[in-house]
C-alpha cells in the first residue's frame, strides 16, 4: 500500500465536505473517485497532499503519517495534475526543471527529453508554454509532475477541459504511467466510462460520504 486514508474528513463552518473517508492506493494501481458535481471528489483529493487540511482523520504515505512529512517534500512525493494546466511563464524545459531546482537538484537535458518523449512531446523543451495547445499544456503538466519522481499521482478531472483527441492522448499517458512506471494514482472524474477505462478500483462519493468501493466493475455495476 502506497497511500492510505483513514477516516478522513473536512468541514467548513457552512458545510461538511468529506465524511470519514477510508481507502488505500496500491502500487501500480489507479483508484477512481466518482460522483456527481458537488459530491466532494475534489475536496477529498485536496486532502491527500494537504492542499487543504483535514478536520478529522489522516493519510499515511508509505506507512508514515503525512503530518510528519514537510509540506514541500509531501508535494514532491504526491504529485498532482489539475483540470487545467497551470504552467509558469517560460519554456517547457524551464517548467520541468522548476520542482527539482527547488530542492537543489538539476534536471539534465537528457532527462528533460526523456520526460517529454514519454508524454509525446519530444523536442518541445525550448518551446514557450504560451504557444502550446490545451492538450499539449496538459501533457507538460504530466511531465512536470513526473520530473519530481512522485510515489503517487493525484489527477483532478485531468481531461475535462480537453477536446476528444487530446482526451484520448492524455488517457493513453495515464495508462502508460501505471503500466510502464508502476506509479499509482487517484483519479477524480465525473465520467464513469473514463473510470472504467483507466482504473482498477473505484469509490463512489455522495454528499461527501463513500457509499460504495471496490473493484471497478463491481462498483460501477451496483
Give the positions of each predicted feature.
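Conserved catalytic motifs of ABC-family nucleotide-binding domains
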Residues: 149
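Catalytic Walker B motif of ABC-type/P-loop ATPase nucleotide-binding domains
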Residues: 153-156
